[in-house]
A protein has these predicted regions:
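Short amphipathic alpha-helical segments
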Residues: 17-24, 58-62, 66, 111
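Small-residue (GG/TT-enriched) beta-loop-alpha framework at ligand/catalytic clefts
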Residues: 1-2, 12, 95-173
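A short alpha->loop->secondary-structure connector
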Residues: 7-10, 56-62, 120-125
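Short glycine-rich phosphate-binding loop at a beta-alpha junction
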Residues: 32-47, 125-128
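Phosphate/pyrophosphate-binding loops at sites that engage ATP/ADP/AMP, CoA/4′-phosphopantetheine
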Residues: 27-38, 74-79
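N-terminal basic/disordered segments at the start of proteins
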Residues: 1-19, 27-31
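Internal amphipathic helical hairpin motif
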Residues: 43-102
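Hydrophobic side chains in well-ordered alpha-helices
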Residues: 24, 28, 114-115
Length: 173
């Protein structure tokens, strides 16, 4: 890994199978002398929800509406919404220009804390859903559509429409 101006260049990468995440990351850091390099790991067991919102809502009202939709989902599932860390991505709905499509992602706060604590001696800077981060591996073009398939224990199919993540499908083995 090297830095040229404001860009970070990854000169090599690979796949490592592991039983213990902490030991594996320590080994990779040692092998690559990457002691000062920020680390990003994949989120696991995240929950995806999709909401359609009226496009004319203000940002404040949109945020409240998304929160309300998630709380309703949690109520239906018997979940406490306070145990989740949530983020969302908003894109245009190509089928209905009056609506926005919201991809809402929720992860258990306790599991996030466990991962953060396990890697606290390293330079962990982010925990990201692989389905969203994987889009950074390709250069998208306007008006082009893409499907990215990531095959692991859980297979994810990320649909990109016109440079925006539109949908994420997950399939268990």
């Amino acid at each position: 890994v090297s830095k040229e101006h404001e860009k970070i260049k990854v000169e090599s990468f690979g796949i490592k199978f592991y039983e213990n995440l902490e030991k594996t990351i320590d080994q990779i850091i040692e092998e690559t002398y990457s002691y000062k390099i920020p680390i990003s790991i994949n989120l696991s067991e995240e929950i995806y929800n999709y909401f359609d919102m009226f496009a004319m809502l203000s940002n404040k009202d949109l945020s409240k509406a998304i929160k309300t939709e998630f709380e309703m989902y949690c109520g239906d599932q018997g979940y406490n919404p306070n145990v989740f860390e949530t983020r969302y991505v908003i894109s245009q709905n190509p089928q209905d220009k009056q609506k926005l499509k919201v991809i809402h992602i929720a992860a258990n706060k306790i599991e996030l804390t466990k991962k953060t604590q396990a890697l606290e001696k390293n330079k962990l800077t982010s925990i990201v859903p692989v389905s969203m981060a994987i889009t950074n591996l390709i250069e998208t073009k306007p008006k082009e559509n893409y499907l990215i398939v990531n095959i692991e224990d859980t297979t994810t199919v990320t649909t990109i429409l016109d440079e925006n993540v539109y949908h994420v499908d997950t399939f268990e083995d």
